[in-house]
Amino acid sequence: MGSEMCIRDRYIPAGIFKIRLPFIHYRWEISECLQAILMCATCLGAIPILEQILGVPYEIAWSMVIINGLLYNLHSLLGDPVVPGWITPAVPLVSAFLTQSQQGPERVKALIALQLVVGLIFLIMGISGMAGKIIGLIPNAIKAGILLGAGFSAIMGEFQDGGRFGKYPITVGIGALLAYFMLFSLLFRKMKDNSKLWHVIGNFGMLPAIIIAVIIGPVSGELPAPNLVLGSIIKVPEIGQIIHTLSPFSIGFPTLSTFISVIPTAIAVYIIAFGDFVSSEELIREADQVRQDEKVDFNANRSNIISAIRNLIEGLVCPYVVLSGPLWAAVTAAVSERYKEGRESMDSLFGGIGTFRWMTFICVALVPVASFVQPILPAALSLTLIVQGYVCCKIGLGMIKTDMERGIAGVMAAILAIKGASWGLLIGIVVYILLNGSFKNPATTAESSEEKA
């Protein structure tokens, strides 16, 4: 009993937060440490997005990734039992919205406004506790349309003229097929069930596909060979240059009209991000049922508030195109699976989560690591978006049950992918009300009827 109480009480209470420090409140997990060394390449994949959308040089983009990596640790530090990440499905929508502005201060201010509004939505939902109720009121056809639109945008962006598939067809093509096979194939799922080796490899998610890209890119001549720089070890973020170039305290705050213009996109982003809270709660619930020696407390309000803090800080210091989301589902699932094997495998869930995020922060700041993966970052980003497109379409299609919902979601998704979130949301809502007669969510209405009965 004493051991159980010890692991349950390893934190410093601070209101809704439960502060946990590495080595004091949880042990360093070697497995997650090694996984983080390899998976930090995905975090560095934000660099080409920042270079392309914001027009910042590589060194500035790299510095922004390091700052973002530090902020990831707020989740394990403040008691949120998940591995956080980008709001990945929203990346195509955000990129499409930002490219409507001219590159330079105007586009940066649009991103500042968007990230601050997204942060405020997270904060309001976290403080009020209304997230679940509000999202539940939105019809599934509209939510599906947003996800399908994000999926269409991701795939269209990679395969359109000038897209990364056209630049690196062999690398991206083979890497994407391998990623699809390892992440979604029924055959590979059977291979994992029958082989511990394939099971371990499968737990690394997209990493094997990225490693293949590192090999295929230079061999095919599409990408330069990795260049391992050993002269210096640690990259010190160029905070002064970031603030001078990107911070609203230097370039000025967005106008009121800019803040108003980002609201539809911000709403779409939050609707997408809300799915992460649902996924987080389910992953943690499953782990908590298996492990009775540690009470894992997932609080969606706390997760909303921490995500708000990250977005607000970045919006004021280094606006980040991929935004700050509450969950990296693939890694959280992998950590959770090892945690469920018992205390011998992982003492505390926070040990796996904290170790992974602290180690990815350290690794993205290591010059040899960043220099080695730099040449293949565009291809790695392309693989991420192509996989995300599949996931968005799969989840979106799974949400809709009737022919009317399918039609509305499809029309809305196409408009959203071509014209942006503002047009997509507007047309989706108008068509839904026109065909359905109201904006009520049939699922919510059915649940209310059952409760009354």
Task: Mark where each language-model region is.
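Membrane-embedded alpha-helical modules
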Residues: 107-224, 350-453
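Helix-coil boundary and interhelical linker segments in multi-pass alpha-helical membrane proteins
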Residues: 48-62, 98-110, 159-163, 259
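Helix-loop-helix junctions within the multi-pass membrane cores of secondary transporters/permeases
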Residues: 15-28, 35-47, 78-147, 290-389
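Membrane-interfacial loop-to-helix junctions in multi-pass transporters
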Residues: 58-66, 142-144, 256-260, 295-305, ...
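Hydrophobic alpha-helical segments of integral membrane proteins
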Residues: 130-138, 155-162, 232-256, 309-312
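Helix-loop-helix hairpins and the membrane-proximal interhelical loops
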Residues: 8-58, 194-198, 202-298, 448-453
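Generic transmembrane alpha-helix motif of multi-pass integral membrane proteins
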Residues: 48-54, 72, 76, 410-418
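Short, small-residue-biased leader/transition segments that mark boundaries at the very start
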Residues: 1-7
